[in-house]
Structures are given as structure tokens and as C-alpha cells.
Amino acid sequence: MSRYIPDDNLSYPVLISIGGRSGSGFYLNANDGSYLVTAKHVLFEEDLKNKKFTLWDKTVTFSSYSKDPTEKTPLVLNANLELVEVKTHPVFDIAIVKVSIFKEKTPEGMWITEFIDGITTKQIGEKHFTVGVPLNSCRKYEDIQVSNEIFVFGYPNSLGIHEKSQEDNELDYSRPLLRKGIIAGKNDLKRTIIIDCPIYQGNSGGLVMECEQVNFERKFFALGVVTKFIPFVENMKSLQYGTVNTSIENSGYGVVVPVDTILEFIQKEKQAAT
């Protein structure tokens, strides 16, 4: 029985756990290695008054699953952020962490990677088969088509009622969820993508994939990373007292930073390091 989305695409989501909090991310395979991509606020607490960013904690774990749908044990990477440098975009809500360098390919086309200092795992010793978004699956901002179908990958942790026993929860919060929507529009001034798809707490940093129908074949492309939802703001004014009560709700639309912005950022950071 065929699946609507390829197995390797379903293994892209990464659960990020840091300082008692969690968010979403994904691995992106650049030319020199694999990078963890997420939203900046997943890893950093923002001090708006002083315009400062502070890491929620000095250690973080990245959990993901292999492309084998029968594999139930996640691949867990532990990152010491005192040894691993986190790069943050100067404009967008984006953070990247280089986790490994590519050593060689297996006969099946999988990269055998070697972790950089500060990244460890208990599962497979020093080598790890990563499942990241390849460069040839990344769609440029200029090529993104409004109205096309999209999928949001992530770990929304604000859904459901969190019970003390995992068995009592409706959701398994250690497994990713998909959400289907469309590309609602593009903001050319900000160079961002607007999606018609609800974004919840925990989805931040998650990957968005576009599905394109070519003849009778479905093709999937990485669009970018979820950074926030667009609020619906309603002001209610008292006619008697003149007071205003503001209600802010989730509009069902979200903002995505395109993947080519992330690739440009990675390239600039590489050039600055040489």
C-alpha cells in the first residue's frame, strides 16, 4: 500500500527539548554537513526591553525517527551549547546548529556523518545516519506558487490535556503530527510565506513542505520554517465607560521563512568563518 507522503519526508521532523520546554525543527543537508534548523525563540528567551537573547539552557536534545516506519525508537542527539555554536539570523526568527559533517555515502545513498564536538548520541556511537532535507528538495521563494497544497511537520505541545500518565493522553507528544493547508500568499516586502494552516505552540521551528502535482506524480519540496501564527485581534469598547477590551486569537494563518533565506544565512556564516 502506497503512502501519500514519502517515508523519508515523514522522518524530517525533529523534537527539540531545552530547559523544560519543547519546539520543532528539522535537519537540513548542506554541502558540508547537516544543520539543525529551528525558530530562534525555541532555543532563546528574548528580552524585548534590552534586545537580548539568552539560551533557555546550556544543553538541548534533538529527537527524530528513521525513514523506516516500523522503527519505534527515536534517534536522540545531545548538544552541549557551550561547545556547539548556535547561529541566529539578524533579521528573521531563525537559529541553526551545525551537528555533523559528511564523511561518505552508503550504497543506499545515505550519508554517514561524524558529529562535531559537543554533539553526542548513545544509539550508534560516533556515527549516525541522519535524515535531512536535501538541497535538491528545497524550493526557492520565487518558485513558490500561491494556492498549492502544503504540510506542516511538528510537535504541537499545547494541544490536548496533558495527563500525568502518557497512556491517558490522547496524543503521543514524542511523535510528530502533520497539518494540511495551502499557500495563502507571499509577502514580498518581508520575503515571507503566508500559509492557511493553524500554528500552535510547539509548532515553531517546524518544516513546511509543498506538494505539487506533476502529471500523475506528487512531488514534495521544502518551503521553509514556521516562525509564528498570525493573530486575529478584536477590540471591544464599552459605550458607557470608554474602556477597551482586546481579544487576541489564532487566525488560522501562519508565517513561514523560506528555505533559501536559511541557505543564504548558512553560506554567509561559512564564509565568515573562513
Predicted features and spans:
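A mid-sequence, solvent-exposed acidic-amphipathic segment
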Residues: 156-202
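Hydrophobic alpha-helical segments and helix pairs
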Residues: 77-132
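Short glycine/Trp-rich loop-beta-loop segment that forms part of the substrate-binding cleft
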Residues: 119-168
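C-terminal cap/linker of serine protease catalytic domains
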Residues: 2, 219-274
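Short, charged beta-turn/beta-strand-edge "cap" motif at the junction between a beta-strand
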Residues: 43, 156-159, 214-215, 230
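Catalytic nucleophile loop of clan PA
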Residues: 197-226
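Catalytic histidine site
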Residues: 4-78, 96, 100-102, 182-186, ...
